[in-house]
């Protein structure tokens, strides 16, 4: 037992006297705010090279969630680290303010149900409301982000609805238009009838866009009636019934053609007596490969009358399934289309060109114009009077009923399939031909693929996998939205088709030059009010009017890198020299969202990537492994976690997980609390230990010759070097692993093995105090980005200086490297851990000494100088070292047939025989048996030892330990005395004594333990600082303390 001194540390106390991390964090946040530490971290790097980081702007009309929390931590760690590495890292917050998310929230708050109500209210009032409601939760966001200890500039943040931002957006539009990369077209697009607007293809690939939905499927007949004049179709097929299958019966009233694959073989089949009664004896046409799929309807005895290549069907005409468009030019014929397959259906595809992209392309080639009997509400128009006013999905029931009555239905089923829904309203989409403006992405697709090779992706496989494949299949981007609140499409067109003209504007100056007024707003309705006479109309009667659509909100998001700095109107040189960004991060779904559209616009506008490095993290899941849901309550409340465990605990839990390597993460309270134990507590405990025993200021020193000091300093060298490499590579999870492992070595080995030196005091062993101070001062700088508030408390407590976040990241060169010592000492730790596992398995307490430990390790002689450490740590009397590992035990490979079998097939038995015969080799995680490779998981290892119960493997090396567990009475007595010391220490503590107080002890023991305590009395007294130690066998009067079983004691302060 030693005297505690203390009083030197903390130099500055940010703990407020509390040992609870959440309370310390509140003190740190208050200090940072008062001190303006964040701004100081920027200012001190004035003149340094900028590190450019793009912060994907969130919407402020909803509260933040765990996804924002996770991404926010990464967005804080990387800039903090890069600042410590000498860069200037401005961090400006931005707000996404336009588009459907904003409009739908405003509609919800206003009780608006459709666009008519918006127009009745007036665009100006509606958009004014959107501008306010979209920032509804900015205060909550600021509080949330600040509580995260995330440093970001809110005061100078940008909003996508700012005039400066929007001017840069219309500049981008005009640039693309002038490059021929924007065009107006009529295409089949995903259309949200609930929100009255088309969507882009990538929006239908966002999370939650595809949902399971039950829909009817129909196989219907199309009677062949003739041959198109001049075609080579087989006239012998007239009278047959062509069968077509559809999952969208509501499109059948718009049918204008059928499509077959000219290279596929089709069969003319006569329906047998046991087939569908209504069609018995009739001849039907379908792909030969799919005849078996219709065995029930065609009958078991159905006969294939003849076979025909699809080319013989091209040019046949047929009876329309409905009569609405009977006279439509070039309609109701069978066309050839290579996209038709025999994977499902009948091999004959019904064509409704207004509602299918392939249908439109096929019909356009045949001169068949689409018909669109559906309005903006997704309801049938008067073109199909029987179903007028019905939502198309609701009309399915009546359409099927009418077709059955007409004898046209061969099969009617219901399927459950994944179907696209609006990412905002959740209603099912329809695909419908609409006029729209497009970015010609296909024109730059190959270049986008090339430019992607210059980006460093984490995880790396995304570059050529999920993102690369998406780029290879990229399609033109529909950027029109038939809505109100957004950046305008800056195109003005003539209102008279006889005098066509299109003007596109890319700046306020250009608008002012043509319209004679400088816009104060680019929002509707202000921008719509700018009109002028058409210069190309000699009559002067036509007017140039802006197209009413606004831009896809993702166009805003993709413009963020340059629009946030009002490029090219301001900051042109800065942006041109600071793009691409050094780093961005969002969740993996943004490979089809923000990451993708940043890439599209940067490639199109600047012929370069938008970012150099990107982290695409996984998804945060609830504690049941499912998506987080408020109604299910399957995740811990964020604020409760902050109040109970602190933000640093949450940060550590999220950042140390596989989620930053692309995996998903289940959030549990237990996992968060485990994070506290991995790094925060060890760090704090080591700091508290230094506080407790220091009597004078320690100094920063790496000169100690003590082996434990040399070891921890060498470990510190490795920690600094490896953590720097990890964070340079943005491998935050690895950095956390490194810090966690170092903290384990620091507290569970270095501090514990050095206790005697610390107890002796800093006069006797200044090198121990200086080393621990140096280690803690350096460790807090290394871990500062990972645990910003915990490290701030400790670092300021140690140094008294302004902030750990204003320091430089340590240099590994400042510390002595000693790879051999680290390797040897880590092996010793492994030896002790293995021995401890055997002891624990046999329920032998640590204070009970045991006879000996055998350590079998290749080249074990190098551990000889450290045998005393092993002996003391494991609490054994003798340590025997041997290099003959096989004499102690071996590991046999056992084939896991269930895992290996599916891959190896019949060879698995051959492998099992070879392994049993010892005919195998092993290198790392791979075993080769009889020439066949077994991968990790396809085999296990089994220890074969002379004394398996007392033998354990040394983790990380090819070695074993054998613990001699034979306990003699002498050893039992010694262990009992150690237990008594512990009991008396507890009695001191419970009595409220100071660590340095001297005491008197009267101890009552059973007669059978009197000899044991008498033998060890001097040792016990010395350990508990007892100047008087009396042994009795009678019961004690007054207040006593239970020491060990059957033993009580009275302790009094001298």
From Swiss-Prot:
Residues 522-543 are annotated as: Disordered. Pfam families: Anticodon_1, DUF5915, tRNA-synt_1. GO terms for molecular function: aminoacyl-tRNA deacylase activity; ATP binding; isoleucine-tRNA ligase activity; tRNA binding; zinc ion binding. A motif ('KMSKS' region) lies at residues 627-631. ATP binds at residue 630. It catalyses: tRNA(Ile) + L-isoleucine + ATP = L-isoleucyl-tRNA(Ile) + AMP + diphosphate. Its main location: cytoplasm. A motif ('HIGH' region) lies at residues 58-68. It is found in: Cytoplasm. It is an enzyme of class 6 (ligase). GO terms for cellular component: cytoplasm. Its EC number is 6.1.1.5. Keywords: Aminoacyl-tRNA synthetase, ATP-binding, Cytoplasm, Ligase, Metal-binding, Nucleotide-binding, Protein biosynthesis, Zinc. SUPFAM superfamilies: Anticodon-binding domain of a subclass of class I aminoacyl-tRNA synthetases, Nucleotidylyl transferase, ValRS/IleRS/LeuRS editing domain. GO terms for biological process: isoleucyl-tRNA aminoacylation. Belongs to the class-I aminoacyl-tRNA synthetase family. IleS type 2 subfamily. NCBIfam families: ileS (TIGR00392). IleRS has two distinct active sites: one for aminoacylation and one for editing. The misactivated valine is translocated from the active site to the editing site, which sterically excludes the correctly activated isoleucine. The single editing site contains two valyl binding pockets, one specific for each substrate (Val-AMP or Val-tRNA(Ile)). PANTHER family: ISOLEUCINE--TRNA LIGASE, CYTOPLASMIC, SOLEUCYL-TRNA SYNTHETASE. Catalyzes the attachment of isoleucine to tRNA(Ile). As IleRS can inadvertently accommodate and process structurally similar amino acids such as valine, to avoid such errors it has two additional distinct tRNA(Ile)-dependent editing activities. One activity is designated as 'pretransfer' editing and involves the hydrolysis of activated Val-AMP. The other activity is designated 'posttransfer' editing and involves deacylation of mischarged Val-tRNA(Ile). Monomer. This is Isoleucine--tRNA ligase.
């Amino acid at each position: 037992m030693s005297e505690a001194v203390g009083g030197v540390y903390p130099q500055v106390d940010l703990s407020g006297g509390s040992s609870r991390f959440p309370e310390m964090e509140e003190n740190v946040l208050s200090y940072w705010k008062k001190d303006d530490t964040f701004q100081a971290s920027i200012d001190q790097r004035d003149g340094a090279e900028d590190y450019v980081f793009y912060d994907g702007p969130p919407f402020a009309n909803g509260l933040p969630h765990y996804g924002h929390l996770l991404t926010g931590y990464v967005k804080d760690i990387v800039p903090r680290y890069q600042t410590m590495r000498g860069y200037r890292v401005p961090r400006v917050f931005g707000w996404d303010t336009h588009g459907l998310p904003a409009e739908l929230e405003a509609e919800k708050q206003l009780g608006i149900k459709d666009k008519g109500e918006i127009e009745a209210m007036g665009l100006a009032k509606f958009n004014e409301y959107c501008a306010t409601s979209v920032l509804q939760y900015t205060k909550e966001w600021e509080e949330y982000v600040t509580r995260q200890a995330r440093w970001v500039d809110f005061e100078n943040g940008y909003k996508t609805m700012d005039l400066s931002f929007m001017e840069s957006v219309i500049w981008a539009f005009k640039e693309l238009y002038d490059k021929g990369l924007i065009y107006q077209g009529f295409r089949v697009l995903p259309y949200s009838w609930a929100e009255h607007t088309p969507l882009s293809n990538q929006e239908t690939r966002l999370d939650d866009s595809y949902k399971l939905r039950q829909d009817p499927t129909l196989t219907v007949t199309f009677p062949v009636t003739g041959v198109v004049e001049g075609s080579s179709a087989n006239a012998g097929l007239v009278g047959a019934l062509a069968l077509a299958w559809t999952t969208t019966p509501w499109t059948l009233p718009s049918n204008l053609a059928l499509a077959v694959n000219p290279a596929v073989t089709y069969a003319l089949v006569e329906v047998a007596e046991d087939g569908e009664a209504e069609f018995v004896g009739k001849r039907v046409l379908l792909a030969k490969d799919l005849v078996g799929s219709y065995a029930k309807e065609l009958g078991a005895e159905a006969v294939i009358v003849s076979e025909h290549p699809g080319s013989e069907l091209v040019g046949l005409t047929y009876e329309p399934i409905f009569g609405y468009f009977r006279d439509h030019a070039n309609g109701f014929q069978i066309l050839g289309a290579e996209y038709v397959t025999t994977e499902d259906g009948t091999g004959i595809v019904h064509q409704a060109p207004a509602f299918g992209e392939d249908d439109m392309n096929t019909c356009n080639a045949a001169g068949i114009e689409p018909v669109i009997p559906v309005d903006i509400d997704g309801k049938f128009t008067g073109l199909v009077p029987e179903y007028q006013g019905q939502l198309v999905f609701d009309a399915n029931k009546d359409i099927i009923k009418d077709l059955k009555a007409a004898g046209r239905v061969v099969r009617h089923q219901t399927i459950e399939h994944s179907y696209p829904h609006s990412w905002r309203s959740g209603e099912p989409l329809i695909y419908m031909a609409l006029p729209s403006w497009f970015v010609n992405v296909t024109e730059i697709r190959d270049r986008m693929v090339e430019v992607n090779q210059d980006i460093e992706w984490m995880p790396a496989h995304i570059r050529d996998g999920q993102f690369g494949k998406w780029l290879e299949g990229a399609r033109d981007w529909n950027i029109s939205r038939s809505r109100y609140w957004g950046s305008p499409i800056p195109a003005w067109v003539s209102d008279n088709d006889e005098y066509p003209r299109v003007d596109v504007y890319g700046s306020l100056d250009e608008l002012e030059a043509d319209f004679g007024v400088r816009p104060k707003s680019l929002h509707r309705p202000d921008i719509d009010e700018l009109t002028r006479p058409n210069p190309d109309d000699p009559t002067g009667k036509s007017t140039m009017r802006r197209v009413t659509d606004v831009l896809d909100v993702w166009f805003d998001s993709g413009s963020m890198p340059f629009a946030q700095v009002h490029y090219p109107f301001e900051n042109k040189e800065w942006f041109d020299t600071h793009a691409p960004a050094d780093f961005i991060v969002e969740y993996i779904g943004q490979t089809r969202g923000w990451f993708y559209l940043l890439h599209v616009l940067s490639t199109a506008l600047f012929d370069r990537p938008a970012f150099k490095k990107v982290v695409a993290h996984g998804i945060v899941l609830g504690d049941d492994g499912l998506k987080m849901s408020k109604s299910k309550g399957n995740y811990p409340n964020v604020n409760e976690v902050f109040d109970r465990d602190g933000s640093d605990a949450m940060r550590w839990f999220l950042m140390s997980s596989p989620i930053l390597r692309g995996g998903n993460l289940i959030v549990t309270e237990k996992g968060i609390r485990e994070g506290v134990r991995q790094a925060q507590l060890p760090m704090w405990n080591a700091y508290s230990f230094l506080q407790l025993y220091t009597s004078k200021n320690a100094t920063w020193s790496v000169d100690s010759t003590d082996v434990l000091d040399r070891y921890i300093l060498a470990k510190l060298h490795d920690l600094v070097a490896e953590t720097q490499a990890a964070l340079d590579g943005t491998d935050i999870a690895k950095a956390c692993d490194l810090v966690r492992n170092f903290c384990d070595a620091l507290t569970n080995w270095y501090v514990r093995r050095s206790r005697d030196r610390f107890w002796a005091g800093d006069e006797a062993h200044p090198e121990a105090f200086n080393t621990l101070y140096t280690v803690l001062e350096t460790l807090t700088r290394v871990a500062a980005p990972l645990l910003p508030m915990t490290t701030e408390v400790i670092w300021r407590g140690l140094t008294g200086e302004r902030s750990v976040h204003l320091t430089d990241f340590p240099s590994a060169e400042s510390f002595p490297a000693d790879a051999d010592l680290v390797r040897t000492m880590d092996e010793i730790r492994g030896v002790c851990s293995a021995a401890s596992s055997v002891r624990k398995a046999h329920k032998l307490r640590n204070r009970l000494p045991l006879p000996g430990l055998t350590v079998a390790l290749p080249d074990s002689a190098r551990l000889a100088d450290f045998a005393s450490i092993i002996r003391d740590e494991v609490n054994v009397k003798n340590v025997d070292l041997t290099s003959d590992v096989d004499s102690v035990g071996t590991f046999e490979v056992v084939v896991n047939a269930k895992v290996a079998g599916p891959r190896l097939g019949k060879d698995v038995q051959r492998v099992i025989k070879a392994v049993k015969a010892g005919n195998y080799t092993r290198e790392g995680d791979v075993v080769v048996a009889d020439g066949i490779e077994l991968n990790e998981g396809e085999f296990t290892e089994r220890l074969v030892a002379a004394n398996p119960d007392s033998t354990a493997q040394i983790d990380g090396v090819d070695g074993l330990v054998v613990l001699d567990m034979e306990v003699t009475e002498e050893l039992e007595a010694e262990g009992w005395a150690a237990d008594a010391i512990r009991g008396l220490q507890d009695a001191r503590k419970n009595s409220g004594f100071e660590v340095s107080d001297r005491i008197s002890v009267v101890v009552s023991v059973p007669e059978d333990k009197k000899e044991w305590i008498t033998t060890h009395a001097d040792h016990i007294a010395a350990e508990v600082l007892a100047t008087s130690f009396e042994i009795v066998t009678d019961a004690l009067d007054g207040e006593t303390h239970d020491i060990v079983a059957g033993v009580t004691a009275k302790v009094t302060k001298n």
